[in-house]
Amino acid sequence: VNCALDANVAKVRKDFTVEAAFQVAGGTACGLFGVSGAGKSTILSCIAGTEQPDRGYVRLGELTLFPPAFPVYLRPIGYLTQDPYLFPHLNVAQNICFGIAEHNGAADKIWINELRDRLQLDSIWRAPSYAISGGQARRVALARMLARKPNLVLLDEPFTGLDRHLVRELLDALGHWHKTLGFTMLVVDHESEVLERLCPQTIAIEAGRIVQQAAWSELRANPATPLLAQLLAPL
């Protein structure tokens, strides 16, 4: 399903009001880039439904996500953050398959097996989730997010704290499924390298406002603000 994202949200915070209006073409990937505390995660939370905007709207294709017309858990959205949020009382397989047991057909089994094999989860498939490593938990969380084949994927710095080898593995897997499944993707990360790998287009955020939306080549060649130029400068 090719679902374009159309978001226009405002959320009042103590330090400033986050106001962002943008569109992401269906099946494409877009980044949100800026310093910590700029409002990137707030925007993502408003789209995911974990926070309610104070005003505005969020649309995904023909669906109106805000104002809410149906429960958050029914939204065709995958949302991945720094914390895997695995269910500690379930094993790895149960975590990944949570919520799709009622669709236990042959196609679902093939898809779950693909996730298991690509993310190298076979050796921990029946392990309790509390007994696996942090890197393994990130793999499980990615598999669980993709298990239901969401139309929109939201990533809020899910690779923070991981070694570069694992980050490359997860980026390769995510890029592969983005191409094959065709979901729309919005990615928050403080590492420009991660965003460049996943997202041809990026939105730069400063103090809750969009200051530039462009391809990475344009952002690097002509940053719109001094702060953005600093963030994009080599170390």
Where are these regions (language model features)?
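Conserved ABC ATPase "signature" region
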Residues: A107-I124
